[in-house]
């Protein structure tokens, strides 16, 4: 694999010390990893500090670590937490860089070809480059990723071999450096200086790496020798310091040298002729014409520019892989001895297993109708067994591990004690007869104590009817349906915490960000109807929503007790018993979590104020609108910096609305 340039140690920074059963969980996990155990499960109850335990393990075993989460929001939260725990190490973020992505597709029934359309988020693209370059430069790296990490990325060997290495005293002509930069897909632009570009002024070449957003490098020549290299502010040109070595990584992950490109183009040409013969034999003349025209254009672009839109579809030829061979992914950028941690594994594993099939069926349609060569099928996510072949050592992290994880290992390490001393809630089963009036009484009791209630139903109609009824009864209630976007969902949770309303009704309250310490009652309607949300895991996760309040209580409304209900009740009672014994032994009084009510993230507070005032932008004069745009621009940038891209997009839309009036 690739040799690392620096060999640093992980250094964990935290004002907390491991407490509860964190110390034994950390010790067991570390001992097992150092003992060579391949797979283990950290079964941590909600609110027991699993991320802190993961951080302790990483710092002690000192291996490059890949943490996989099941969506961007969760990955962003974990990235922020790990950044705080490891300020001196490389904590990187690797998720899909598309703000918007419409994959290339063909619908035969209506003869509709949908061209690939996407909007790439520049900030995330920078972070992806930062992740891959960090993995090749050092070993103290944590990459927090979504399942994007199992998608094709280009050869790490080609990527590493293409690095342009510069140091003062190196004999290289200015023109040779410019050619080398163009070869690794850097673009010359003397006016608009951005990531992945360089500019030239006499004997000075300024390079803006793809993994940076503020700092560039100034390479000064004396004849055909590098005189010195300085780090500079990209915007102002202010010198920040001198560097004695500079590694410039390619501006794209799909990079191929000239020799390999010639071979790849020849293979693409040969495959094209083969496929054209197949189409002609089958009488598919339209498909043959379409494929010939598209592929020949791409070949011309590859020859002239070394790149074409959709270059990833030719990655099999460019990487020199055989048919059916797995693509290179982020996992190949790690050294052999690395650690994988899968957060919320009961959700994430399902995603890893399902990615391949969906991608395959869409691409087969494109191949069959002459939009792509058959080799495009090998630009794909990894299959489950291919992902498993990359696993050296893995920790599955979940409150409710799935069947897959339990099949992989019998080593289950429990983390049940919460640092706050909070107990799992008491669970009781009540009959469905008169359940709504019974529930109304329970809600009123909570409202008097300024506490909140979650109600989970099985159908949309039931949720809507219940919400309408409670509104008539004078209860401040909201219904959270599946169409609500992440940002709106976060705002609803904030309003619930602030007491804008007291009751939240929903079908699936298991999504991320639904942990509300103010919730002391969780009511589960139709608890005896078996299914995804009423199986043992679903019930345990739902019960966990009341585990952040010292008054936490769960009522299941059901006429029979199913096996799933019984197992969930028994497991909750088992955990509660262990927690109570620990609290008694150590004299701990459970305290409700005191969690600051942030307005999504701090930067949105100003926006919220604007919204609260309900400013009529039509009534603002030109100068006031200009000032509002400036404010919004600043807030948008701040949102991007803390990786809240959905908020940034919302602010951007507000800006466009204001600008449209001028």
From Swiss-Prot:
Q: Name one GO cellular component term.
A: excinuclease repair complex
- Superkingdom of source: Bacteria
* UniProt GO BP: nucleotide-excision repair; SOS response
Domain Helicase C-terminal, which positions?
435-601
Alphabetically sorted, this entry's keywords are:
ATP-binding, Cytoplasm, DNA damage, DNA excision, DNA repair, Excision nuclease, Helicase, Hydrolase, Nucleotide-binding, SOS response
Q: Any idea where the UVR domain is?
A: 626-661
Segments carrying motif Beta-hairpin: 97-120
Which SMART domains does UniProt cross-reference here? Answer: DEXDc, HELICc
The free-text domain note is: The beta-hairpin motif is involved in DNA binding.
Q: What does this protein do?
A: The UvrABC repair system catalyzes the recognition and processing of DNA lesions. A damage recognition complex composed of 2 UvrA and 2 UvrB subunits scans DNA for abnormalities. Upon binding of the UvrA(2)B(2) complex to a putative damaged site, the DNA wraps around one UvrB monomer. DNA wrap is dependent on ATP binding by UvrB and probably causes local melting of the DNA helix, facilitating insertion of UvrB beta-hairpin between the DNA strands. Then UvrB probes one DNA strand for the presence of a lesion.
Q: What is this protein called?
A: UvrABC system protein B
What is the native source organism of this protein? Streptococcus pneumoniae (strain P1031)
Recorded name of the encoding gene: uvrB
């Amino acid at each position: 694999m690739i040799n690392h340039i620096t060999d640093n140690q992980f250094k964990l920074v935290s004002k907390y010390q491991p407490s509860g059963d964190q110390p034994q969980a950390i010790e067991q996990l570390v001992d097992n990893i150092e003992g060579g155990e391949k797979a283990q499960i950290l079964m941590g109850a909600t609110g027991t500090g699993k991320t802190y335990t993961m951080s302790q393990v990483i710092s002690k075993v000192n291996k490059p670590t890949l943490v996989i989460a099941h969506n961007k929001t969760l990955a962003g939260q974990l990235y922020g937490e790990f950044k705080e725990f490891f300020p001196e190490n490389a904590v990187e973020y690797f998720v899909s860089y598309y703000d918007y992505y419409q994959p290339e597709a063909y619908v035969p029934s209506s003869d509709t070809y949908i061209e690939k359309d996407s909007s790439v988020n520049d900030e995330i693209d920078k972070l992806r480059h930062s992740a891959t370059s960090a993995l090749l430069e050092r070993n103290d790296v944590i990459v927090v990723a979504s399942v994007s990490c199992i998608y094709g990325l280009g050869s790490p060997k080609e990527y590493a071999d293409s690095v342009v290495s510069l140091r003062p005293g190196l004999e290289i002509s200015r023109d040779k450096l410019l050619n080398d930069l163009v070869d690794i897909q850097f673009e010359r632009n003397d006016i608009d200086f951005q990531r992945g570009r360089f500019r030239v002024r006499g004997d000075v070449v300024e390079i803006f790496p793809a993994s940076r957003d503020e700092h560039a490098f100034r390479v000064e020549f004396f004849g055909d020798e590098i005189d010195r290299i300085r780090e500079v502010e990209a915007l102002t040109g202010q010198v920040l310091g001198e560097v004695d070595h500079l590694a410039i990584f390619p501006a794209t992950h799909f990079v191929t040298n000239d020799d390999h490109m010639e071979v790849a183009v020849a293979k693409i040409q040969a495959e094209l002729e083969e496929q054209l013969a197949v189409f002609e034999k089958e009488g598919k003349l339209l498909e043959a014409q379409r494929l010939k025209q598209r592929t020949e254009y791409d070949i011309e672009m590859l020859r002239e520019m070394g790149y074409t839109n959709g270059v990833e579809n030719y990655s099999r030829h460019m990487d020199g892989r055989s048919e059916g061979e797995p693509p290179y992914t982020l996992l190949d950028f790690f050294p052999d001895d690395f650690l994988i941690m899968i957060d919320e594994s009961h959700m994430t594993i399902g995603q890893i297993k399902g990615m391949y099939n969906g991608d395959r069926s869409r691409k087969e349609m494109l191949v069959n109708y002459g939009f792509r060569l058959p080799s495009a099928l090998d630009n794909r996510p990894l299959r489950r067994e291919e992902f498993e072949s990359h696993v050296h050592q893995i920790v599955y992290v979940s409150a409710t591990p799935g069947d897959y994880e339990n099949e992989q290992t019998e080593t289950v390490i429990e983390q049940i004690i919460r640092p706050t001393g909070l107990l799992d809630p008491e669970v009781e089963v009540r009959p469905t007869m008169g359940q709504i009036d019974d529930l109304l009484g329970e809600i009123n009791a909570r409202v008097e104590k300024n506490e909140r209630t979650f109600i989970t139903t099985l159908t949309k109609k039931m949720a809507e009817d219940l919400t309408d009824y409670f509104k008539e009864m004078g209860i401040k209630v909201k219904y959270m349906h599946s169409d609500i976007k992440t940002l709106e969902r976060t705002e609803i949770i904030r309003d619930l915490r602030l007491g804008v309303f007291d009751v939240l009704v929903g079908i699936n309250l298991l999504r991320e960000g639904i942990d509300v310490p103010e919730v002391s009652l969780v009511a589960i309607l139709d608890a005896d109807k078996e299914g995804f949300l009423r199986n043992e895991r679903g019930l345990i996760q739902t019960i966990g929503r009341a585990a952040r309040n010292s008054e936490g209580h769960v009522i299941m409304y059901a006429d029979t007790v199913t096996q799933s209900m019984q197992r969930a009740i028994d497991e909750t009672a088992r955990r509660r018993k262990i927690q109570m014994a620990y609290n008694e032994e150590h004299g701990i009084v459970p305290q409700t979590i005191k969690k600051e009510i942030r307005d999504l993230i701090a930067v949105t507070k100003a926006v919220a104020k604007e919204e609260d005032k309900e400013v009529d932008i039509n009534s603002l004069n030109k100068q006031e609108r200009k000032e509002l745009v400036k404010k919004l621009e600043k807030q948008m940038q701040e949102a991007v910096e803390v990786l809240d891209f959905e908020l940034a997009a919302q602010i951007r839309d507000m800006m466009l609305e204001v600008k449209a009036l001028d």
